[in-house]
């Protein structure tokens, strides 16, 4: 039972780290990256479809993305979806390819984005700590039901704390890398 609690806590913490990584990937840096457009959905025959299912997103150069749309009738819809996203991008179509130049980030915008990234990291840390709290309360309830000893509780809490520290350290490393990426000119 205790191993189940530890394994559950570890897998939930890993999901928290992955979620934080995903949220940070959405924050636009000065460099072109295909994952920048992952959140964009296009109206495709009446249903909202992810952009990567209606076209191929690639990097043209360090500041330009290219979207090769599979169905040429979808070019207008894809352009509209990119423009209406909150990324502040202006796509230009050239045949079946849509080019998306990324404007350079101003110093002020970089600082705002760093605040956003730090907030995402803090949300990730909070989620990891909540998992720790849940695991510790589960173990204590086992002790109250006399299904484990006080020593088992202490050992499990120590193990869960080690998981917590390791996952928070991972989130901090992701944050540091993202901040460095944002401050690159």
Curated annotation (Swiss-Prot):
Cross-referenced CDD domains: RRF
GO molecular function, one term: ribosomal large subunit binding
Residue ranges the record marks as coiled coil: none
Gene Ontology terms: cellular component: cytosol
UniProt keyword annotations, A-Z: Cytoplasm, Protein biosynthesis
Any GO BP annotation: cytoplasmic translational termination
Compartmental location: Cytoplasm
UniProt main location, coarse: cytoplasm
Keyword Phosphoprotein found: no
Family: Belongs to the RRF family.
Function: Responsible for the release of ribosomes from messenger RNA at the termination of protein biosynthesis. May increase the efficiency of translation by recycling ribosomes from one round of translation to another.
NCBIfam families: frr
Protein's name in the database: Ribosome-recycling factor
Gene name as annotated: frr
């Amino acid at each position: 039972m205790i191993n189940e609690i530890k394994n559950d806590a570890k897998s939930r913490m890993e999901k928290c780290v992955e979620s934080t990584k995903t949220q940070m990937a959405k924050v636009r840096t000065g460099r072109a990256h295909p994952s920048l457009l992952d959140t964009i959905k296009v109206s495709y025959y009446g249903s909202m479809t992810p952009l990567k299912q209606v076209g191929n997103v690639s990097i043209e150069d360090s500041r330009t993305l290219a979207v090769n749309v599979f169905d040429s009738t979808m070019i207008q819809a894809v352009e509209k979806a990119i423009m209406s996203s909150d990324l502040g991008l202006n796509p230009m179509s050239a045949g079946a390819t849509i080019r998306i130049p990324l404007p350079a980030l101003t110093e002020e915008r970089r600082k705002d984005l760093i605040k956003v990234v730090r907030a995402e990291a803090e949300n990730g840390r909070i989620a990891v700590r909540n998992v720790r709290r849940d695991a510790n309360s589960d173990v204590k309830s086992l002790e109250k039901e006399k299904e484990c000893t006080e020593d088992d509780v202490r050992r499990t809490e120590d193990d869960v704390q080690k998981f917590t520290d390791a996952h928070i350290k991972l989130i901090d490393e992701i944050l540091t890398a993202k901040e460095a990426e944002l401050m690159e000119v």
